[in-house]
A protein has these predicted regions:
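Flavin-dependent oxidoreductases
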Residues: 184-214
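Short beta-strand micro-motifs enriched in acidic
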Residues: 136-139, 214-218
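C-terminal helical "tail/cap" subdomain of flavin- and related membrane-associated enzymes
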Residues: 2-10, 87, 256, 300-301, ...
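Conserved N-terminal helical subregion
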Residues: 2-12, 29, 54-174, 178-191, ...
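Conserved mid-domain beta->alpha element of the FAD-binding
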Residues: 12-42, 160-161, 188, 265-357, ...
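FAD/FMN-dependent oxidoreductases across multiple families
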Residues: 196, 207, 217, 227-300, ...
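Short phosphate-binding/catalytic loops that engage adenosine nucleotides
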Residues: 33, 66, 252
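Short helix-loop capping/hinge motifs at secondary-structure junctions, enriched
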Residues: 68, 194-199, 231-233, 253, ...
Length: 407
């Protein structure tokens, strides 16, 4: 492939049309790259459920001018916190305290809404659906990377591998790596109409199980659950019935949320995480991002957030397409330590949340109550160094500056 010139913009191929891949596509497009996104699915249908965007991801989106459209969808106002299955509060946390500490509130929205926002910033025809892709050449400083599709081969100055937890590109780059490990628990997610009675957003920790109920911007409710289970398990009847068995006697509004779900609308996925770091997040002209690079447990709500950060940092280091091979090591240097630190922190949080013995659970709950009495800031400290992250390069397209200094 010819080197990028004033007559030919650099070319990027993004493998995967999820949140991380689309964010990378927007960031590269705004840096004058010619971008093609290859998505295996036949359509970017409204699959998935809710996603929580913390202030760190919102600031990343500010770089591409999309932070404020996301903030406008904030539905969480007032208090929330952590409860036990009987409904007793273990700690209370307010949206105002979160915004004050980290420069913005947590924004819960449907993944399909975020995908629409990102797609609106891309030229028509950028995303090709029904387009499975195979990396056939990683490229180097003398030749292009090559991605092969059923319609032919595409040369690229940069390949962005955003192909998820089972990443085929990752296996090509690092065939000896063991990949993600089963975390010991499974998750369910569902979006339902709001219950008749108002509720306070919450996460509830039981014995080897948890439940969360959060409002969405469109008036619906996003609920998620997790429980210890063998890998690959499925309900003998349907997953809504399984949720009723496991959570039907928990505090309101949990039973009502489960009852309102359509059986076909309950999504179940086993949780895996990248226990062993990759040697790098790049090779040749190829860069990994999101779950393809650093799959993590959902216990900190940072999986999608870190993919968005990856995308912005990658575009920053890719620059205008000159010397991509020489620039990608800086992407690994910046992202690998941070993301693997969050992987480890999420794993520790998962261990705490999934305690199952009566005595350890009682001790855990007593400790959380004791710590929460010292004030909401104590609990929020667990997100210091995560939610207060600042993007590289130029700052915000939005007007609001964060109220805390970078850590």
């Amino acid at each position: 492939m010819d080197r990028p010139t004033s007559h030919r913009p650099p070319r990027a191929v993004v493998v995967g049309g999820g949140v991380g891949g689309l964010t990378a596509a927007v960031a590269l497009h705004q840096a004058d790259w010619h971008v093609t996104v290859l998505e295996r699915a036949e359509a970017l249908a409204p699959v998935g459920a809710g996603i929580g965007l913390a202030p760190n991801a919102q600031r990343a989106l500010d770089v591409i001018g999309l932070g404020d459209p996301v903030r406008e969808l904030a539905a969480w106002q007032g208090d929330g916190g952590l409860r036990d299955p009987a409904g007793r509060w273990l700690n209370r946390t307010g949206s105002a305290a979160t915004a004050e500490r980290f420069g913005g509130p947590l924004v819960l929205l449907h993944r399909a809404t975020l995908v629409r926002i990102l797609m609106s910033a891309l030229p028509a025809g950028t995303v090709r659906t029904g387009a499975p892709a195979e990396l056939t050449d990683t490229g180097d400083d003398r030749r292009a990377a090559v991605v092969t599709t059923p319609d032919g081969a595409l040369g690229a100055d940069l390949v962005v591998a955003a192909d998820g937890i089972g990443s085929a590109v990752r296996r090509v780059l690092f065939p000896g790596h063991p990949g993600p490990r089963y975390s010991g628990f499974t998750t369910w997610r569902v979006v339902v109409p709001a219950p008749d009675r108002p509720f306070t957003p919450h996460e509830t920790w039981g014995r080897g199980a948890l439940w969360g109920t959060q409002p969405l911007e469109d008036g619906r409710v996003y609920a998620y659950a997790a429980a210890l289970a063998p890998a690959g398990g499925r309900a003998p009847d349907d997953e809504r019935t399984e949720l009723l068995r496991r959570f039907g006697d928990w505090h309101d509004p949990v039973p009502g949320i489960v009852a309102a779900a359509e059986p076909a609308g309950v999504l179940r996925h086993d949780v895996h995480h990248m226990a062993e770091p990759l040697p790098a997040y790049h090779r040749g002209r190829v860069a990994l991002l999101g779950d393809a690079a650093h799959a993590m447990q959902p216990t900190l709500g940072q999986g999608g957030n870190q993919a968005i950060e990856d995308a912005i940092v990658l575009a920053h280091h890719a620059g205008r397409g000159h010397d991509v091979v020489g620039r990608l090591p800086a992407y690994t240097e910046e992202r690998l330590p941070r993301t693997m630190g969050i992987v480890r922190q999420a794993t520790r949080t998962g261990r705490l949340a999934m305690l199952s013995g009566a005595a350890p659970v009682a001790a855990r709950n007593a400790l959380i109550r004791a710590v929460s009495r010292l004030g909401p800031g104590i609990v929020l400290r667990g997100f210091d160094g995560i939610a207060d992250w600042q993007p590289p390069g130029r700052t915000y397209a939005a007007g609001a500056e964060p109220t805390t200094a970078p850590r």
